[in-house]
Amino acid sequence: MSKIVKVIGREIIDSRGNPTVEAEVHLEGGFVGLAAAPSGASTGSREALELRDGDKSRFLGKGVTKAVDAVNGPIAQALTCKDAKDQAALDKTMIDLDGTENKSKFGANAILAVSLAAAKAASASKGMPLYEHIAELNGTAGKFSMPLPMMNIINGGEHADNNVDIQEFMIQPVGAKSIKEAVRMGSEVFHNLAKVLKSKGMNTAVGDEGGYAPNLESNAAALAAIKEAVEKAGYMLGKDITLAMDCAASEFFGEATGNYNLKGEGKTFTSQEFTHYLEDLTKQYPIVSIEDGLNESDWDGFAYQTKVLGDKIQLVGDDLFVTNTKILKEGIEKGIANSILIKFNQIGSLTETLAAIKMAKDAGYTTIISHRSGETEDATIADLAVGTAAGQIKTGSMSRSDRVAKYNQLIRIEEALGDRAPFNGLREVKGQA
């Protein structure tokens, strides 16, 4: 019933109007899995390769017909008649057939789409929801939790066309008792933030991830606006709602100078100075998590940042670790950061993603399942977060259907699991239990 009989790839459109790869995996019992690969804007240099055509006459060079051809050709041939329930074997077959260190032959976008579609088909053949199947693959059958959301309500950096350098300013509804309540709280703050920004004559157009993207005089001004919105919504900052930031500092790091350049504020910092700039923000506002607070290659700086802030707040590696167990292992050994952002298209298969989650948890690092700035209606990351009991999820703001699709799936899962999937709130955040 779980033997693969057909694999189909196609080119579809993501939330930024760019092509991406969608895959279908059909099983002999009539079961079908459908999945699409996401795409990032600010990407780590060591991510698995997203294969694009480079043909400027189609989609400005961003077409993915080469990756789709890989799905419909060699990948389909290799996986036909294989057992979809053996996820590790399927992923190994594709990785070995690709034969490159970074999946550059077929593209991580091709391999991942098939990997996820196969998992969905297998879960259907077993008559269970995807999150239950993922828990079994993870070796944690029956162990679930609902993730604390990080909601990106002000977008900057590579995710918006504004003057704000820090890429994401997020709220965490830690006072909620359930994911359903967390979503309501996030929505109320989001709408009150629009009122705050409008009252200041600011733009309320949204960025790639559904957050507002106004021009602001400083990063502190973004935090101040959110504080006002939280209070307008009737909540207490630091008790009901905490704050998180994704600096994506690699995007404003000067390779030639080794400095960090906040153009929006007209300020330049050394590595240690920028750590203390962030430290000052954490003293002014209840910021409990900072992601990519330095350039991905500034490991000495990260060691210093971890020494200064690591026992107080969660320090998340995204571009730093790129969901790669080899890099994460080195980070753990050197005491770099204390948390990892999990993006399965950074590594390119479900099996490798689960390995990164396990390694992080075994080392005492927290795990945050994440979307990308280029998304589709595919809500697999919601099931991944619950099925691995990851603890936290980052999937954008309270607008754009590509973002809310994930929140809506979490609401459905919570309804189905009830008390079997506790919502632990702030206890999931490193340094805040």
Curated annotation (Swiss-Prot):
It catalyses: (2R)-2-phosphoglycerate = phosphoenolpyruvate + H2O. Its cofactor is Mg(2+). Its main location: cytoplasm. CDD domains: enolase (cd03313). It holds the Pfam family Enolase_N. GO terms for molecular function: magnesium ion binding; phosphopyruvate hydratase activity. Component of the RNA degradosome, a multiprotein complex involved in RNA processing and mRNA degradation. Catalyzes the reversible conversion of 2-phosphoglycerate (2-PG) into phosphoenolpyruvate (PEP). It is essential for the degradation of carbohydrates via glycolysis. This is Enolase. It comes from Sodalis glossinidius (strain morsitans). The lineage of its organism: Bacteria, Pseudomonadati, Pseudomonadota, Gammaproteobacteria, Enterobacterales.
